[in-house]
Design a protein with these regions (language model features):
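Nucleotide-activated chemistry modules centered on ATP-dependent adenylation/adenylyltransferase
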Residues: 1-175
């Protein structure tokens, strides 16, 4: 096993966890104060235990203090609507994936692992700049350039829909 996965505990990352469990040595969740962290991180832990994958939680409390996003402001602040709607921009936590991938990369290299898995997907692109293919490619290049072991990103959901991820999850008997 040569990989680390960034796992929130949501549908996308849990599906990725199961789909590539045979490659994953370590799972990392980040507690950055998002409204959903207290629900999703325990799911991540449960699924990692089921798969016998070591799971760690990295606290990023500073993000809630210094970053602005409705995801950090309490559930009443989060707008409802479609991903592409303008009002959904308030849910962006600036450079969240960049921060998490940077930390995950350092942890991966420190543990002799070769790649970092992340479950960003096509539906995220409309609103989250750090989920777009261009960002993932640039971050992959930066990580490879900045590590002795050429640590890369594996993001197989980048160009597929959430519906497709749900279909994959269903095939894996995830509900």
């Amino acid at each position: 096993k040569d990989s680390l996965i960034v796992v929130s505990g949501g549908m996308d990352s849990i599906t990725l966890l199961y789909e590539y469990a045979d490659r994953i040595a370590l799972a990392v969740s980040f507690d950055y104060g998002a409204n959903h962290n207290h629900k999703e991180i325990p799911f991540a832990r449960i699924h990692c235990e089921r798969l016998k994958i070591k799971h760690i939680v990295i606290p990023l409390a500073f993000m809630k203090e210094y970053f602005r996003s409705s995801l950090l402001d309490g559930s009443d602040s989060v707008p409802e609507g479609h991903y592409a709607d303008e009002n959904m921009k308030s849910t962006v936590v600036p450079f969240r994936n960049g921060i998490m991938l940077s930390i995950a990369c350092g942890i991966a290299e420190s543990n002799g692992l070769k790649q970092v898995l992340i479950a960003n997907h096509g539906g995220d692109h409309a609103i989250y700049p750090d989920c777009r293919s261009e960002f993932i490619q640039a971050m992959d290049k930066a990580m490879r350039s900045g590590t002795y072991e050429n640590i890369g990103i594996f993001a197989p959901y980048t160009d597929i829909s959430k519906t497709e991820i749900a279909s994959r999850g269903k095939k894996l008997n995830l509900n």
